[in-house]
Amino acid sequence: MSSTVSYWILNSTRNSIATLQGGRRLYSRYVSNRNKLKWRLFSRVPPTLNSSPCGGFTLCKAYRHTSTEEDDFHLQLSPEQINEVLRAGETTHKILDLESRVPNSVLRFESNQLAANSPVEDRRGVASCLQTNGLMFGIFDGHGGHACAQAVSERLFYYVAVSLMSHQTLEHMEGAMESMKPLLPILHWLKHPGDSIYKDVTSVHLDHLRVYWQELLDLHMEMGLSIEEALMYSFQRLDSDISLEIQAPLEDEVTRNLSLQVAFSGATACMAHVDGIHLHVANAGDCRAILGVQEDNGMWSCLPLTRDHNAWNQAELSRLKREHPESEDRTIIMEDRLLGVLIPCRAFGDVQLKWSKELQRSILERGFNTEALNIYQFTPPHYYTPPYLTAEPEVTYHRLRPQDKFLVLASDGLWDMLSNEDVVRLVVGHLAEADWHKTDLAQRPANLGLMQSLLLQRKASGLHEADQNAATRLIRHAIGNNEYGEMEAERLAAMLTLPEDLARMYRDDITVTVVYFNSESIGAYYKGG
């Protein structure tokens, strides 16, 4: 069955766009025509943050940019203002049994997002599957604009959910469409602050999703795809649909322009599917997922579930060299970037690294206002044997155990600043701090005197006002820690006060979701088995 599905998925797209199988980074992810850049490629020397003689904080600009501000400027934010900025995008959601068809292995999730780009190019998503089992969590990191990340965040979960449906459920879906009756609900979305959808193209997206489930019906699989197959094929099929949509004649100008933006921008993606004790993670690009594990002796460790797809990954370099002629070995990766322009080696969209030159030219000559649409009109040097980029994910399976306490998914804006071990340590500290607070209040009746005492203890121990959200704590430390891993209030304030055109030079968009597991529920699976 797998070979049949593989043949179908690879041959369901046009030959012209066939998808192939299979230290710290520069923050600028995509380098377009360098003569058109507002700033040129910058060095790996980090920007400097120095204490000012007057006791404030001075940020010295390290790169050329378009601001007309003075080169040095004084920055101050109160602790209350810092908290307001950091917590604006946070959300916490407890998973109820009614949101899953089986006993939950997930207790709750906490999420937050801090923008560096304007508008922010990251997206995130959480949804439960209503016709099958499972919860899905996703992080989507856009580049060259937010359009592709927005589209993938809206659509990918639907492709996965449809892939997992039984033949009978798919027949019910198709029958409803043919008779113009309401469709079965597919997903229940758990929303975040700032979530939005592209309403103008919803019908187009549904049409392509329908074609996908019609082809699944033609395979006559009673139980649907396995989760691993569903993740693998959903990533590739959605990327193919994104590419096909701009090639099809579209009369509506809004739809046409939006499809162009989605196809020519790009997005990396990392998503997790949790069904009882079964955890699958699919990753394409340089977002990342890790597990926080507590052993029986109380010691904590980090278990990586993904590998970054970039020039620092030797397996990715080998894959790229296998897929292209030996004559291109020295040009596939230049300046630690794919063809010298893109850091991640796997991504949705970015058709300028997938299509032939002829296809790109024919699409862009249809009268689009590409300058107004922020479309890159150039072909990288040494562009001989496309496609160079793929959206095929690496899929990891992990059988959850009682010692697996939490999962962290985040865009590379977090991992550029903190190591895997730092992230686990900070989440563990967050949990310990919350337990300390609860224990003190539980042991003694709460009153104003007790609360004042706790606040004084916190101040004496050097703790800032406790973040109720672990994702917020991670973002706080990502941008506020100095080179020794210590939080500096002045540095944090400076990083949050950067002008829009300068912020991107010092940090990336950061999006984080922390998923907490129910150890008792997970343990019950093993006892029951």
Curated annotation (Swiss-Prot):
<feature type="binding site">
    <location>
        <position position="141"/>
    </location>
    <ligand>
        <name>Mn(2+) 2</name>
    </ligand>
</feature>
<feature type="binding site">
    <location>
        <position position="142"/>
    </location>
    <ligand>
        <name>Mn(2+) 1</name>
    </ligand>
</feature>
<keyword id="KW-0496">Mitochondrion</keyword>
<keyword id="KW-0378">Hydrolase</keyword>
<dbReference type="GO" id="GO:0042093">
    <property type="term" value="P:T-helper cell differentiation"/>
</dbReference>
<dbReference type="GO" id="GO:0005739">
    <property type="term" value="C:mitochondrion"/>
</dbReference>
<dbReference type="InterPro" id="IPR000222">
    <property type="entry name" value="PP2C_BS"/>
</dbReference>
<comment type="similarity">
    <text>Belongs to the PP2C family.</text>
</comment>
<keyword id="KW-0464">Manganese</keyword>
<feature type="binding site">
    <location>
        <position position="508"/>
    </location>
    <ligand>
        <name>Mn(2+) 2</name>
    </ligand>
</feature>
<feature type="binding site">
    <location>
        <position position="141"/>
    </location>
    <ligand>
        <name>Mn(2+) 1</name>
    </ligand>
</feature>
<dbReference type="GO" id="GO:0007165">
    <property type="term" value="P:signal transduction"/>
</dbReference>
<feature type="transit peptide" description="Mitochondrion">
    <location>
        <begin position="1"/>
        <end position="66"/>
    </location>
</feature>
<feature type="domain" description="PPM-type phosphatase">
    <location>
        <begin position="106"/>
        <end position="517"/>
    </location>
</feature>
<dbReference type="GO" id="GO:0005759">
    <property type="term" value="C:mitochondrial matrix"/>
</dbReference>
<keyword id="KW-0809">Transit peptide</keyword>
<keyword id="KW-0479">Metal-binding</keyword>
<dbReference type="Pfam" id="PF00481">
    <property type="entry name" value="PP2C"/>
</dbReference>
<comment type="function">
    <text>Mitochondrial enzyme that catalyzes the dephosphorylation and concomitant reactivation of the alpha subunit of the E1 component of the pyruvate dehydrogenase complex (PDC), thereby stimulating the conversion of pyruvate into acetyl-CoA. Acts as a crucial regulator of T cell metabolism and function, with a particular focus on T-helper Th17.</text>
</comment>
<dbReference type="InterPro" id="IPR001932">
    <property type="entry name" value="PPM-type_phosphatase-like_dom"/>
</dbReference>
<dbReference type="GO" id="GO:0004741">
    <property type="term" value="F:[pyruvate dehydrogenase (acetyl-transferring)]-phosphatase activity"/>
</dbReference>
<dbReference type="InterPro" id="IPR015655">
    <property type="entry name" value="PP2C"/>
</dbReference>
<dbReference type="InterPro" id="IPR036457">
    <property type="entry name" value="PPM-type-like_dom_sf"/>
</dbReference>
<dbReference type="GO" id="GO:0046872">
    <property type="term" value="F:metal ion binding"/>
</dbReference>
<feature type="binding site">
    <location>
        <position position="412"/>
    </location>
    <ligand>
        <name>Mn(2+) 2</name>
    </ligand>
</feature>
<protein>
    <recommendedName>
        <fullName>[Pyruvate dehydrogenase [acetyl-transferring]]-phosphatase 2, mitochondrial</fullName>
        <ecNumber>3.1.3.43</ecNumber>
    </recommendedName>
</protein>
<keyword id="KW-0460">Magnesium</keyword>
<keyword id="KW-0904">Protein phosphatase</keyword>
